[in-house]
UniProtKB/Swiss-Prot annotation:
Official protein name in the record: Magnesium-chelatase subunit ChlI
Alphabetized Gene3D superfamilies for the sequence: Magnesium chelatase subunit I, C-Terminal domain (1.10.8.80), P-loop containing nucleotide triphosphate hydrolases (3.40.50.300)
Superkingdom, natural source: Bacteria
Keyword match NAD: no
Pfam families: AAA_lid_2 (PF17863), Mg_chelatase (PF01078)
Its job: Involved in chlorophyll biosynthesis; introduces a magnesium ion into protoporphyrin IX to yield Mg-protoporphyrin IX.
Lineage: Bacteria, Bacillati, Cyanobacteriota, Cyanophyceae, Synechococcales
A single GO molecular function term of this UniProt record: ATP binding
Transmembrane intervals: none
Length: 357
């Protein structure tokens, strides 16, 4: 992937620039790390209404570099990576048939709350399959989201079964649709982003655990910052193009940083002692399973790559461990300390980090 950020064309819908978003650093970091390494497993963003969740996610999708896709392919198939090719494209590659390649923006797919399983996964036209002997597949939202971002607002209100389907595809990278003995399989590798307001209900713990990271966001309380945010939004709404032009240099720099991190990621290593200590933290917090250990290691590596380093430091782990573990702790109604502080406390003890005076 190469950096390809151009100034927004006058015909394309203008999106609020990612680098202009004030505060919400925890959410921004979680999103960036998932883009650098999608295997982290997505991010769940829980917080107050009107805190810029949707704005930030759209801004991230707009910031990302263009990707190469096979022309007229409904699955955004990669022309070079077999893991991201549909069956038809793979057959064409194997037979050395020339492919028409185009560049396109990373797709961001919004999943509506009322979506059905057929709309999400796609459907097979049985009549056509039986009468014409062809696999007539109508791709769903998972096909459209391949190699992009799938955003579910109010994910805590979505049907549990649909959340399961999304998490299975995000984890495995493939979507399988079966009906009447006919089976279709296509790549569905995307960054899953869910957001919601905890007042409207929590996700079941088994589903929550499947999200790689969990960011909590709060309404900005400082009056000066609130005024700055309101002024920025007003300026953007009145003159979007000049406003975006002010941030073009910062946007290009961040995009280049993301691309460099993606290229550097395979070379990043994490010391054995640090890995043992991460597992020690997870064990002490009584985290079920090993997802917490795996995701923390991946996120720390992605952060090191983002900072341009090939070795993970204690500071990298410190910045990601709360995001990776806070939603995996068992809820204790009598506990007065919140889960993030609990993770931080155990991390400092295990890693021997002393609070600065």
């Amino acid at each position: 992937m190469t950096a390809t950020l151009a100034a927004p064309s006058k015909t394309r819908r203008v999106v609020f620039p990612f680098t202009a978003i004030v505060g919400q650093d925890e959410m921004k970091l979680a999103l960036l790390l998932n883009v650098i390494d999608p295997k982290i497993g997505g991010v769940m963003i829980m917080g107050d209404r009107g805190t810029g969740k949707s704005t930030t996610i759209r801004a991230l999708a707009d910031l990302l570099p263009e990707i190469e896709v096979v022309a007229n392919d409904p699955f955004n198939s990669s022309p070079s990576d077999p893991e991201m090719m549909s069956e038809e494209v793979r057959i064409r590659v194997d037979s050395q048939e020339p492919l028409s390649i185009v560049k396109k923006k990373v797709t961001m797919v919004d999943l509506p709350l009322g979506a059905t399983e057929d709309r999400v996964c796609g459907t097979i036209d049985i009549e056509k399959a039986l009468s014409e002997g062809v696999k007539a597949f109508e791709p769903g939202l998972l096909a459209k989201a391949n190699r992009g971002i799938l955003y579910v607002d109010e994910v805590n209100l979505l049907d549990d079964h649909l959340v399961d389907v999304l998490l299975d595809s995000a984890a495995g990278g493939w979507n399988t649709v079966e009906r009447e003995g006919i089976s279709i399989r296509h790549p569905a590798r995307f960054v899953l982003v869910g957001s919601g307001n905890p007042e409207e209900g929590e996700l079941r713990p088994q589903l929550l655990d499947r999200f790689g990271m969990h960011a909590e966001i709060r309404t900005v309380r400082e009056p000066e910052l609130r005024v700055k945010i309101v002024e920025q939004r007003t300026e953007f709404d009145q003159n979007p193009h000049p406003f975006c032009d002010q941030y073009q240099t910062e946007q290009e720099a961040l995009q280049a940083k993301i691309v460099n991190a993606q290229n550097l990621l395979p070379q990043v290593t994490i010391d054995y002692d640090y890995r043992v200590k991460v597992s020690e933290v997870c064990a002490e917090l009584d985290v079920d399973g090993l997802r917490g250990d795996i995701v923390t290691n991946r996120a720390a590596k992605a952060l090191a790559a983002f900072e341009g380093r090939t070795e993970v430091t204690v500071d990298d782990i410190s910045r990601v461990i709360v995001l990776c573990l806070r939603h995996r702790l068992r809820k204790d109604p009598l506990e007065s300390i919140d889960s993030g502080s609990k993770v931080e406390k155990v991390f400092k003890r295990v890693f021997g980090v002393v609070d600065e005076a």
